[in-house]
From Swiss-Prot:
This is Urease subunit gamma. Transmembrane segments: none annotated. Pfam families: Urease_gamma. It catalyses: urea + 2 H2O + H(+) = hydrogencarbonate + 2 NH4(+). It is an enzyme of class 3 (hydrolase).
């Protein structure tokens, strides 16, 4: 299987998010990279599903709460920006204060 660098990056994000979800389901608090992976994966998959940028900007804030992450992680992530592929092209999705 040959993957472009872009496809490799998406695969890495997807796997990191899946690993973080498994850890979260075991009751572990997520660290910074795990939180970013889950939020990023949510945005990429939402775009793939045909959701709008506005919808993702709102739903991206509902993926994780303070109870899901280690102390200090919400303050380390003031925003998440992802270039996602939508049915009508690539767009930048920005989620401000993604962990409420």
């Amino acid at each position: 299987m040959r993957l472009t660098p872009h496809e490799q990056e998406r695969l890495l994000i997807s796997y990191a998010a899946e690993l973080a979800r498994r850890r979260r389901s075991r009751g572990l608090l997520l660290n910074h990279p795990e939180a970013i992976a889950i939020i990023t994966d949510h945005l990429l998959e939402g775009a793939r599903d045909g959701r709008t940028v506005a919808e993702l900007m709102v739903s991206g804030r509902e993926v994780l709460g303070r109870d899901d992450v280690m102390d200090g992680v919400p303050e380390m992530i003031p925003d998440v920006q992802v270039e996602a592929t939508f049915p009508d092209g690539t767009k930048l999705v920005t989620v401000h204060h993604p962990i409420g």
